[in-house]
């Protein structure tokens, strides 16, 4: 989810309601001589946990049905059950997305 702020937001903010917000891709943008901050963010509950944040980021882009579909189509193609060259491309994009998330989380939590 994209969010906009008037001041640079923190990467991790813990709220009093038992949830926390993790932000990444934080960048300063200037529009009509007004500076704002834009970032991607997800809200999770409980104590801050990298695995929860990773899953929330994945679910922000891929619901479980779509994720399983990509994996199943790739496996079906690899095993020769179906011929679907797009399955390899879609699975590779998905794996690159997961790698990007890992790189984001390695930058700091």
Predicted ranges, named:
Residues 2-109:
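A preference for well-ordered globular domain cores
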């Amino acid at each position: 989810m994209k969010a906009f702020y008037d001041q640079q937001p923190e990467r991790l903010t813990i709220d009093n309601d038992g949830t926390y917000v993790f932000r990444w891709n934080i960048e300063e943008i200037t529009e009509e001589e007004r500076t704002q901050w834009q970032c991607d963010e997800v809200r999770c509950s409980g104590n801050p946990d990298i695995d929860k944040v990773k899953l929330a980021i994945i679910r922000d882009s891929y619901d479980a049905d779509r994720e399983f579909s990509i994996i199943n189509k790739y496996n079906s193609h690899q095993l020769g059950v179906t011929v679907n060259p797009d399955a390899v491309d879609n699975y590779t994009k998905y794996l690159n997305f997961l790698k990007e998330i890992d790189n984001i989380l390695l930058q700091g939590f």
